[in-house]
Amino acid sequence: MARVTVEDCVEKVPNRFALVLLSAHRARGISAGAALMVDRDNDKNPVVALREIADDVIDHEGLKEHLISTLQRVDEHTEAEEEAETLALLADPSHMQMSELELVRALQSDRDGGQEERY
């Protein structure tokens, strides 16, 4: 069997940087136990991933979307909870009745307490 080259893969994925990301992601998936789409032929996982890309046996867009979802660090559930908490605070007018002196004291105590916690 001929060795897979980057030129074979660049025809399928034109951006070399995207090719590296996709093939590395696929190789990690193979290491985690994903089913192989081509025969291994005693090749290592990165080579198998490149051969799968070159042979066009995997869905590039699906692989790209899965890669993006694994790289995202936003937890939508946490974001929704924070937004609900903010809306609840805005709906409660009791915290708006703080005097200027009380506000300054609260800010200073937060500032002073925050420095002690860091050390």
From Swiss-Prot:
GO terms for cellular component: DNA-directed RNA polymerase complex. The keyword Transferase applies. Disulfide bonds: none annotated. GO terms for biological process: DNA-templated transcription. Its EC number is 2.7.7.6. GO terms for molecular function: DNA binding; DNA-directed RNA polymerase activity. Pfam families: RNA_pol_Rpb6. It comes from the Bacteria. It catalyses: RNA(n) + a ribonucleoside 5'-triphosphate = RNA(n+1) + diphosphate. Keywords: DNA-directed RNA polymerase, Nucleotidyltransferase, Transcription, Transferase. Belongs to the RNA polymerase subunit omega family. HAMAP family: RNApol_bact_RpoZ. The RNAP catalytic core consists of 2 alpha, 1 beta, 1 beta' and 1 omega subunit. When a sigma factor is associated with the core the holoenzyme is formed, which can initiate transcription. Promotes RNA polymerase assembly. Latches the N- and C-terminal regions of the beta' subunit thereby facilitating its interaction with the beta and alpha subunits. This is DNA-directed RNA polymerase subunit omega. It comes from Caulobacter vibrioides (strain NA1000 / CB15N) (Caulobacter crescentus). The lineage of its organism: Bacteria, Pseudomonadati, Pseudomonadota, Alphaproteobacteria, Caulobacterales. The gene is rpoZ.
